[in-house]
């Protein structure tokens, strides 16, 4: 059991060895899957009676490590920390090698004698790793375009039904949270998906829809 009260955890699974439980949900967590967890979350391995020998990589770091660095300001851009359990990153073999290179660089630096450059180099490698993950998530959005377009259609239908009902008078403008919940997605994943598919934020899309039906 991993308790992430003060750590930023990432897990890269190398073999099929059971599922990770995150709250009440289970990660879509097969070989070559990369999982991100927000601080304060508790995860565990599901015990179904079978014996597994877990194999993979985990990177956990205390927020104090990046305090006072440029990475602190960038963390808000890594929206995948708030994705739902079924929105994990599935790596290609080449992407997996890139990620492992980042892990090996961090591991090598941790084994090096500590000097005035240690923190900078470790943090820079963590930031490089996160930036690669942004790229790979962009690729995943593209390769799952047919799924994304289905979500976009459902979003459009949701807005049509909403504005044709009495909800605007009773509730007001639908929020991004409301739409994401209705589509069974996390707000961050939903927002990123809409931005990549339309070029507009989910909030901008809702505003444009309101103008269109006015």
Protein language model features and the residues they cover:
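Basic/polar phosphate-binding segments, predominantly the helix-turn-helix DNA-binding elements
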Residues: 173-212
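N-terminal regulatory/effector-sensing and dimerization cores
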Residues: 1-84, 115
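Amphipathic alpha-helical segments enriched in hydrophobic/aromatic residues interleaved with Lys/Arg
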Residues: 80-127, 132, 136
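Short, intrinsically disordered, charge-balanced linker/junction segments flanking boundaries
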Residues: 1, 211-214
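Solvent-exposed, amphipathic alpha-helical segments
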Residues: 98-112, 154, 158-165, 213
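Polybasic "coupling" helices that flank or enter modular domains
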Residues: 117-120, 124-131, 138-166, 170
